[in-house]
A protein has these predicted regions:
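N-terminal FAD cofactor-binding segment of flavoenzymes
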Residues: 44-85
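Beta1/beta-strand and adjacent pyrophosphate-binding region of the FAD-binding site
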Residues: 2-14
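A conserved short coil-to-beta-strand element within the FAD-binding core of flavoproteins
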Residues: 122-137
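Glycine-rich FAD pyrophosphate-binding loop
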Residues: 7-9, 21-47
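Short beta-strand to alpha-helix junction loop
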Residues: 58-62, 87, 91-113
Length: 144
């Protein structure tokens, strides 16, 4: 039958984790992302030379699989522990949380290790899935 072709729509954490698992099972995976970059809710945007994270400001890590992945991301320089300073009533102290992490240099850094080696198509919005003569097809601005 040959290698199975699979499209994943969205290059956020879930889409890229799914693509990574499918690629590891010998599927031919293509990820389609409508924006120019990766991350979904972990996206880092740039405007006039300034970068900002419009979604999540940090992640918490509480399950063993995610702990392992964050270790990979930190070794790759894509994530770092975050201990924010808390200011309340004119007093400041470090937050007592050990499981807060940020992406480096921005939050989208966290997903970059997942995207390595994956066929990723950015700037392509998928509008519809259509059953064609050869199977399912994706409808985009450029056609099928």
């Amino acid at each position: 039958m040959g290698q199975q072709r699979i499209a994943v729509i969205g290059a956020g954490m879930a889409g890229l984790a799914c693509a990574r698992q499918l690629a590891g099972a010998d599927a031919r995976v293509t990820v389609f992302e409508q924006s120019r970059g990766l991350g979904g809710r972990l996206a880092t945007r740039r405007v006039d030379g300034l970068a900002y994270d419009p979604g999540a400001q940090y992640l918490t890590v509480r399950n063993s699989a995610f702990v392992r992945y964050m270790g990979i991301a930190m070794r790759a320089g894509a994530a770092a522990p975050w201990r924010p300073a808390v200011l309340e009533d004119n007093r400041s102290w470090d937050a007592p949380f050990d499981d807060w992490y940020v992406g480096t240099p921005g939050m989208s850094g966290i997903v970059r290790p997942l995207a390595r080696g994956i066929d990723l198509r950015t700037g392509i919005a998928v509008h519809e899935l259509v059953r064609g003569p050869a199977g399912w097809e994706l409808e985009t601005d450029a056609g099928r």
